[in-house]
């Protein structure tokens, strides 16, 4: 597919996300949380759109991507709580960010694919990745500790 055409996405890609232990992302009290997949578990649908302005961002970190939640419509963004970068879910539409004249770094993640897994690094806080704890149910966070206490590799399942 032509990269330029791909950047002019008409609508977001829809995905369910899980870690390699089959813990899926759900929305629980307006917080993105990873929980073990069970028969009744309904994963949240994540929306993804590429950033149109690649020349203003770092290269070789992955594809700059806006991430959101389909219902209720909201978007992921990174901010600071004191000195600590944190992951937040806020009101908004990733289509609006996609259509802005410049990148919205707080809401951009470098999506890097490796085989069947993906990582999501904050564009606003390089070196900080979306992560979940290694066991049980837990909210999504940002971490710099790759593959140690937290899981940063996720599988993306296409939603039709």
Curated annotation (Swiss-Prot):
Role played: Cytokine that binds to and signals through the IL1RL2/IL-36R receptor which in turn activates NF-kappa-B and MAPK signaling pathways in target cells linked to a pro-inflammatory response. Part of the IL-36 signaling system that is thought to be present in epithelial barriers and to take part in local inflammatory response; similar to the IL-1 system with which it shares the coreceptor IL1RAP. Seems to be involved in skin inflammatory response by acting on keratinocytes, dendritic cells and indirectly on T-cells to drive tissue infiltration, cell maturation and cell proliferation.
Descriptive protein name: Interleukin-36 alpha
Pfam families xref list: IL1
Record's keyword annotation contains Metal-binding: no
Propeptide position ranges: 1-7
Post-translational modification: N-terminal truncation leads to a dramatic enhancement of its activity (>1000-fold).
Gene Ontology MF annotations: cytokine activity; interleukin-1 receptor binding
Family matches, as InterPro entries: IL-1_fam (IPR000975), IL-1RA/IL-36 (IPR003297), IL1/FGF (IPR008996)
Tissues in which the protein is found: Highly expressed in embryonic tissue and in tissues containing epithelial cells. Elevated expression levels are detected in chronic kidney disease; expressed inepithelia from the distal convoluted tubules (DCTs) to the cortical collecting ducts (CCDs) in single nephrons (at protein level).
Keywords: Cytokine, Cytoplasm, Immunity, Inflammatory response, Innate immunity, Nitration, Secreted
Modified residues (3'-nitrotyrosine): 98
Major localization class: cytoplasm
Keyword Secreted in annotation: yes
GO biological process per UniProt: inflammatory response; innate immune response; positive regulation of cytokine production; positive regulation of interleukin-6 production
Family: Belongs to the IL-1 family.
Description of what induces expression: By IL-22 in normal and psoriasis-like skin.
Gene Ontology CC terms, in alphabetical order: cytoplasm; extracellular space
Subcellular location per the Swiss-Prot or TrEMBL entry: Cytoplasm; Secreted
Species the sequence originates in: Mus musculus
Subunit structure: Interacts with TMED10; the interaction mediates the translocation from the cytoplasm into the ERGIC (endoplasmic reticulum-Golgi intermediate compartment) and thereby secretion.
Cysteine pairings via disulfide bonds: none
């Amino acid at each position: 597919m032509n990269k330029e055409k791909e950047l002019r996405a008409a609508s977001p890609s829809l995905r369910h996300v899980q870690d390699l232990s089959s813990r899926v992302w759900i929305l629980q009290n307006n917080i993105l949380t990873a929980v073990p997949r069970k028969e009744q578990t309904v994963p949240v649908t994540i929306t993804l759109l590429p950033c149109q302005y690649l020349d203003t961002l770092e290269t070789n970190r992955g594809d700059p991507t806006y991430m959101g939640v389909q219902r209720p419509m909201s978007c992921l963004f990174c901010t600071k709580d004191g000195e600590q970068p944190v992951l937040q879910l806020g009101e908004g539409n990733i289509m609006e960010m996609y259509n802005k004249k410049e990148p919205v770094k707080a809401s951009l993640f470098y999506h890097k694919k490796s085989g069947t897994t993906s990582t999501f690094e904050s564009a606003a806080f390089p070196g900080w990745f979306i992560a979940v704890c290694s066991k049980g149910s837990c909210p999504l966070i940002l971490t710099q500790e790759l593959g140690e206490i937290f899981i940063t590799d996720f599988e993306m399942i296409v939603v039709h």
